[in-house]
Amino acid sequence: MNNNDYKDNNENLNSENTVDNKSSQNSGHRRSNVQHTGSNTANNNSRHNVREGSNNNSEHHSSNSSEGHHSHHSSGEHHSHSGKKRLTKQQKKKRTITIVSIVAAVVVIIGIMGVKGLSDAKGMLKNANELKTEMNDMLGAVKAQDAEAANTAVLKLDNTTYKISKTLSSPLWKMASHIPVAGKYVKSVDTLIGLVEDASDDIIKPAVATISEYPMSGLKVGDGFSVTTINAYLDLLEQIQQVVNNMTAKMNKVELPGSMGTMISSYSDKITSLMSMYTDYEDYIPLMKAFIGDGSDKVYLLAAQNTAEIRAAGGFPGSIGTIRVEDGVMSIGDFNPVNDVLATYPPDEANVTRKELKIFNDTLIYSRDASFNPDFERAAQIWALAYEAKHGESVDGVLSLTPTIIQKVLRISGPITLPDGTELNGDNAVSVLQYELYYKYLSDRNTGMDDSEANDYVDGLFAETAKQAMAVLVSGFDFKRINEYVDMFNEGVEENTIMLWFVDEQEEQYAKDAGCSGNLNDDPANPEAGVFFSLYEPCKLGWFLNIDTEMSEPVINADGTRSYDITVTLTNTIKRSNITRAGGYILGGFDGGIRGFVHLFAPAGGTIANFETNNGLKITTDEYDNLEVGYNVDLVVEAGSPQVIKYTVTTAEGVDTPLKIRTTPTLQAYR
């Protein structure tokens, strides 16, 4: 992101920087992929020479599918999409290699070919059963990171597939491939054997080579992670991409009797595990490679945004730490209060504009308040420049987390204990951090501390929480649970509780492609409306805020545009008992009322209009970053008196992709 993008004319963020990740992700990298070669070249060549005489002429090609979906959001959760379609579970399942299909297909042709054919079929059936065992052994060895056992299993599997291929290439079985009905099953067997060979040569053997050269025991280095080891596995995943696409194309041509489905499915889960790591990581490989780089020095800010002090882009960044890549090791540093990390005011290079001060309030003159702007790219840029101004060190990007991620980390890595004896775990962390600690130390307290001491103590507990959570993530990292970490990251991306901004424009495009940049909608073809709320009064009432949205089915207008009626309901769930127990640090100055800002954005190329409110609330309209926006920067959501805003959003002309809604993440699912 160039600082010059932020002049008073409010030009688009990165508007000239749309990059096709798929075509460019392999260019400009500072490292090359690890190359792997199998040790069984002679045997491999022999097998493939046999297969050249068979009737399997399937060509390798890529098969991609995508599907849009209608998005209805409530409970403050939301999805952030960059336009890239993720694979559904069913589409991912098509990528798996159903080895046991071989057994089923062989049964179909038993008896068709007479005595010789029967003898061959029995032999292939025996070989197919051996394949099942060998595949189980191989998968088990790969999961256990046992390179020696995996090599042994691969050799056995290669030998078995060679035997089946040799049989299928004989004149008798070539003739069988032309027999009506049964012939297509013979060809399917041949195709499936080819898939086994492809998996062995192009996936398993490179994987075993990587495991041998970069064992997972070398992943953790002191208090950090080895960049070389991480890159080796990322390179492996990137290397098998085309192989997976080729297998998908071949699987689409396989025809087997429907009655065999039950028999096949009993083993499909085992085969699915072969590809699960790739399919889970696919969207994030370029992003992760950009983040860690080639081992040369990098510095990132790690902002812990506090949702109890909710802001449009997440929350108040009460504690900020660093992630450093130095001497080939990536490590997480200590967290410190935001005022110790960032300069009080953004430097001139940040170019905070008059329009930004008007739309998002003049508190944007403080660096710490940049997240009043829902565009995380912009907030992160200001934080990065403010850090550089204070410390004289430039950063490569900013990673943002909210307390919900802390709870998800602890659910995998185990509990931590704070200095006051409070245990945080995978079930209670959000409630404790965003509600209970405030009421323990800052209301009806008998701690022997005055207000200032109590505030400092609680801030210290939050900083210690972030530090311990990141430490246990590193120390307790278990590669065998990698899918759980990926799921956690996926959830954070979908909810916008994990966001990432890079200084480098190409790397920032990877974040956009992965859906975690937190940028405002800039793609008319994939429309996304924004519903954002920020607490303005200093308080901790974000715990009690609900943001719920409803969206109608679209109305197709005469000009081809589509209009949606949207209803936003802001609810304050605080009870009188909470109000009477709380002090001013928790409540602010409105006796439990939540005073703040609301910003409602149209999608790229679209419009927003026809505002109606339930209590006369005035909505001002303007334009920011080429997006229409309706907003109010002086509203109060009283307990028991929701603020309801209704309006119409129209997408760009010629766009039939369903509208999605992104909202500021709330804590209502954790109460």
Task: Say what each PLM segment does.
Residues 106-112:
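Short conserved active-site loop signatures built around small residues
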Residues 1-85:
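N-terminal targeting leaders characterized by basic, low-complexity, disordered sequences
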Residues 81-90, 302:
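N-terminal targeting leaders only when they are immediately followed by extended low-complexity/repeat-rich tracts
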Residues 94-97, 112-670:
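Non-catalytic, solvent-exposed segments at the cell envelope interface
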Residues 88-106:
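N-terminal Sec-pathway targeting helices
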